A protein has these predicted regions:
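Conserved short "hinge" loops at termini or chain/domain junctions
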Residues: 1-74, 88-193
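Catalytic-loop motifs flanking and including active-site residues across diverse enzymes
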Residues: 77
Length: 193
């Protein structure tokens, strides 16, 4: 069975242009973080149907879909990629196990510095995600795929905000709608959001 190619909303050149990521970082290190960012964070706010629609049509988007992609999704994807990538630039998994990356002319940063850089990237990602969610909720009638998800698809989270370093979202309660996520203390009630 052949693996299908992943459709990426951003490429490594875009990430290196928008962030402080050094141009010498290999694409093979960055691409897995892009894929993870799209699956783990972006899908959470787009929902499965809109994500799949955008992936299918990424090279031919026009109108509101092009605006959504170019103005909102790409920057959010870029910074969520950095949240996932920064720890991988610090630690490397090789034949000998986990090692801290270092070259001859550099010194590795402390864990505190690492966490600070991840949190800076997360703050940027949350900023762009809040803009994305705001745009989608205000213009949901322009995006029929935003509201067409049915179980087992991911339903989009409709609110995103930051509280004490955590991104807190309120969307459909997946437990109520047939998902396998049990209600948590972050839910307004165990049965409805």
């Amino acid at each position: 069975m052949a693996l299908t190619a992943e459709v990426l909303f951003v490429n490594t050149d875009y990430i290196k242009r928008i962030t402080s990521l050094n141009g010498s970082v290999e694409d093979s290190v960055v691409v897995p973080a892009i894929i993870l960012a799209q699956d783990k964070y972006i899908q959470q706010y787009l929902g499965t149907d809109l994500l799949n629609y955008l992936k299918t049509n990424v090279s031919s988007l026009t109108g509101v879909y092009e605006t959504l992609m170019d103005t909102y999704i790409r920057k959010a994807t870029c910074w969520w990629t950095m949240v996932e990538l920064i720890p991988n630039l610090y630690v490397k998994l090789d034949n000998g196990g986990l090692v801290i990356r270092a070259s001859e002319n550099t010194n590795p940063i402390s864990e505190d510095d690492l966490h600070r850089e991840v949190e800076r990237a997360r703050a940027n990602a949350q900023f762009y995600t809040e803009r994305l969610v705001s745009y989608l909720t205000k213009n949901s009638s322009s995006f029929p795929q935003y509201t067409s998800n049915v179980s087992p698809d991911m339903h989009p989270e409709k609110v995103a905000y930051n509280q004490n370093g955590l991104t807190v979202s309120k969307g459909k309660n997946f437990f109520k709608y047939g998902g396998d996520r049990k209600p948590s203390v972050l839910d307004n009630s165990p049965y409805d959001c």
